[in-house]
A protein has these predicted regions:
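Charged/polar low-complexity intrinsically disordered regions
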Residues: 41-258, 262
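Charge-dense, extended regions
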Residues: 195-409
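Histidine (H) residue identity feature
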Residues: 5, 10, 32, 41, ...
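Residue-identity detector for threonine
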Residues: 2, 21-23, 45, 181, ...
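N-terminal Skp1-binding subsegment of the F-box domain
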Residues: 1-38, 44, 50-54
Length: 409
């Protein structure tokens, strides 16, 4: 009998506890019977211990919600509302442990967390230099702990959103739009919600890049109608891919060549979707009908944000935001500057106007040196007026070439 066979199962379990991800656990239990036997007797404990080391600090409430979103029925509206209420309660109480879920839900969470770590670092490497140059801001070369938290939270909320709301027809009807606003978005301030748009935009342009490459150059895709005039936020195939989950999106982004991209991007979704159920149209609901008029309570509805009082802006803060995103934070100051000239009645999720702001993730970073609000507003306005930081492939084509590509399909 070999040494490893003489080890007690609780010792073997403690070895498995040290693995970094559930994927590594799967490899281990297939490699030796003693690991399999130990896992079979202690599956819940081993999975929770691995995940407890993998979950970033202060994000256990979101991890539990993400676990639950993997198993809840999105068409059961009461269950979805209860899940989101529990998320609020968990954030307030900040538990440091995971609740009991099926092993496949633990595996899904572990894959999402592993994807988030890589996606976050890639986003920082691209967006932070853009922010520093656009706002002439002093900043360290990497993200601070506070900024990493914001990005982790935004990615996790994005995945929860996809699990609960970006669902195909055959799953049933999702939560109605007003309840998505009320239960998913409204417990957070507008600037914390707009942090999700920063990670969304990063994912959107990466998927659009892969989609454009495959749709333009793959022979089989010649059978598929493609309208190159569609922006990524309204292109059904790009939007469908964006709802497939962070691990799939990471695979698309990391695809090293055309053939890998082609394998990852099917010509047709395997299940039918309503466009309003896809990511961008869901994110539009982060602002309620009539926008922020109730909270800011101006003297008349057409007043612009810049004319509202500080006391009323305080009402937009939410307890779930955390101190790093309160009314003294840079994300708040930048959000107010970006939207300063918009009517209180119509502060909107405006893809055309704000995609450059999202590309530099301006609602994520902290300014190391304070800047006057007028200066920040001026630089923000310039971002709205310049060409996109990341133009689509077809932007370099002549109009006749686009028409020819569409008509020959």
């Amino acid at each position: 009998m070999t040494f490893i066979h003489r080890l007690p199962l609780h010792i073997v379990s403690s070895i498995l506890d040290q693995l970094d991800t559930i994927t590594e656990l799967g490899i281990a239990i297939r490699s030796h019977r003693i690991f399999y036997n130990s896992f079979k007797h202690n599956a819940q404990t081993i999975c929770r211990n691995i995940l407890s080391s993998q979950i970033p600090p202060n994000l256990f409430p979101y991890a539990n919600a993400l676990l639950e979103s993997n198993v809840v029925d999105p068409s059961n509206h009461d269950s979805v509302k209860d899940l989101l209420r529990r998320l609020e309660s968990r954030i307030k109480n900040d538990p440091k442990s995971l609740e009991r879920f099926p092993v496949n839900a633990y595996a899904a969470l572990s894959r999402a967390l592993a994807a988030i770590e890589i996606l976050r670092e890639n986003l920082v490497s691209e967006a932070l230099p853009l922010f520093m140059s656009s706002f002439e801001a002093d900043h360290a070369s990497g993200a601070s702990q506070q900024e990493v938290f914001r990005l982790n939270r935004a990615f996790m909320r994005y995945q929860i959103m996809c699990n609960l709301f970006c669902v195909p027809y055959d799953v049933g009807s999702r939560l109605v739009d007003e309840d998505i606003t009320r239960y998913f978005f409204h417990p957070f301030s507008p600037w914390v919600n707009e942090q999700i748009l920063c990670v969304y935009r990063y994912l959107e342009r990466k998927v659009a890049e892969a989609y454009d490459d495959v749709a333009a150059h793959d022979v089989d895709w010649g059978k598929v109608p493609v309208e190159w005039a569609y922006d990524a936020n309204v292109c059904p195939m790009i939007q469908w891919n964006l709802g497939r989950g962070l691990p799939v999106l990471l695979s698309i982004i990391r695809a090293a060549n055309f053939e890998e991209r082609r394998q990852l991007l099917p010509m047709h979704p395997p299940r039918a979707y309503n466009m309003s159920n896809l990511p961008f149209q869901t994110l539009v609901h982060m602002l309620p009908e009539n926008s922020l008029i109730k909270a800011l309570n101006p003297n008349f509805s057409q007043r612009i944000l810049d004319e509202c009082t500080e006391a009323n802006f305080q009402r937009l803060c939410q307890p779930l935001d955390g101190v790093q995103d309160d009314i003294s934070s840079t994300p708040y100051l930048l959000w107010r500057a970006v939207h300063s000239k918009e009517s209180v009645f119509w502060v909107a999720v405006d893809w055309e106007l704000h995609k450059n702001h999202w590309d530099c993730a301006c609602f994520v970073w902290d300014l190391e040196k304070p800047q006057r609000s007028a200066v920040v507003q001026e630089r923000s306005n310039e971002l709205s007026d310049i060409e996109p930081f990341f133009p689509r492939l077809q932007s370099s084509w002549e109009h006749d070439d686009k028409l020819r590509s569409e008509n020959e399909r």
